[in-house]
Amino acid sequence: MATDFKSLPVIDISRLLLKCDDPDMAEDVGVAEVVQQLDKACRDAGFFYVIGHGISEDVINKVREITREFFKLPYEEKLKIKMTPAAGYRGYQRIGENVTKGIPDIHEAIDCYREIKQGKYGDIGKVMEGPNQWPENPQEFKELMEEYIKLCTDLSRKILRGISLALAGSPYEFEGKMAGDPFWVMRLIGYPGAEFTNGQPENDIGCGAHTDYGLLTLVNQDDDKTALQVRNLGGEWISAIPIPGSFVCNIGDMLKILSNGVYESTLHRVINNSPQYRVCVAFFYETNFDAVVEPLDICKQKYPGGRGGCQVFKRAVYGEHLVSKVQTNFAM
């Protein structure tokens, strides 16, 4: 459960990345400091910034800028990669087609998923099968995004080794059958600028309050517009003020289950009060698509009944969880 945090912690993970493939990483003093910070952030807020992550600021900025270029294209051009159920819920959706808790969100987006070969997961994966839809314009869009996905996948794996150390004393709990073949989701999102009445923004909800589905999210947001908000225990909405070159990270529903409720999948939302268009690229690192997710044995031993002794977490199959969300998220 989140605390009454008033800001999100900033964690320099450079030492963790340096030692993350060392079998003796747990004995390194610098790694231990990072692990302690990750543990506290996941318990207190479920959100944190990472710096020292090794992905260049130039790449981070290019990903947002080419996304912005796509959203500036004529509507008819964007519709060439229109999302449909037949396309595996991959592609472009116009403003209002994404729905959170029954309410249309004020954003447009491209949704991409790790591609699933026909029949790989049987009935559970059938609705998600198919290739991603990449636009022909801007040029180099697909090439840049595929490279960015590789970078984010590797970074997420390394951060989760640190979180695994914090939870279980071993860096490898989120590999193998759990996340050795991780699924991923990427959403490229554009939020229109706010309309103003009597000098005040209208406060349209760019994305309604929700939690994320999987293990870990990396948020690449515009440097000059504050819009992402995280709810603390007291019900206050705390702004995730942009820090250039950083990622905002948060944990998802699957990690909450694995931790037996020790780590929080925290409610968050987006309200773009700026008159300018805002771009955000969110990368979601997930378990294996067919992973059966339940509290880790060591978490059941250390934290029986969940945090505070009152929470019970049943097992979930990640792919079923994702499909149930995806099939109700869009008004098409």
Swiss-Prot record:
What does the record give as the reaction this protein catalyses?
Answer: L-homoarginine + 2-oxoglutarate + O2 = 6-hydroxy-L-homoarginine + succinate + CO2
Q: Which cofactors, by name?
A: Fe(2+)
Binding of Fe cation occurs at 210, 212, 268
* pH dependence of function: Optimum pH is 7.2. Inactive below pH 5 and above pH 9.
**A Pfam match:** DIOX_N
Q: How is the cofactor bound?
A: Binds 1 Fe(2+) ion per subunit.
Q: What class of enzyme is it?
A: oxidoreductase
Q: What is its main location?
A: cytoplasm
**GO terms assigned for molecular function:** 2-oxoglutarate-dependent dioxygenase activity; metal ion binding
Q: What is its EC number?
A: 1.14.11.-
Q: Fe2OG dioxygenase domain spans which residues? A: 182-287
Q: Which domain of life is it from?
A: Eukaryota
Q: Where are the transmembrane segments?
A: none
Per the entry, what this protein does is: 2-oxoglutarate-dependent dioxygenase catalyzing homoarginine 6-hydroxylation thus producing 6-hydroxy-L-homoarginine. Guanidine (Gd) is in turn synthesized by the spontaneous conversion of 6-hydroxy-L-homoarginine to (S)-2-amino-6-oxohexanoate (RHEA:79843); guanidine is a nitrogen-rich compound that can serve as a defense or signaling substance.
Question: What is the recorded name of this protein?
Answer: Homoarginine-6-hydroxylase 2-ODD-C23.1
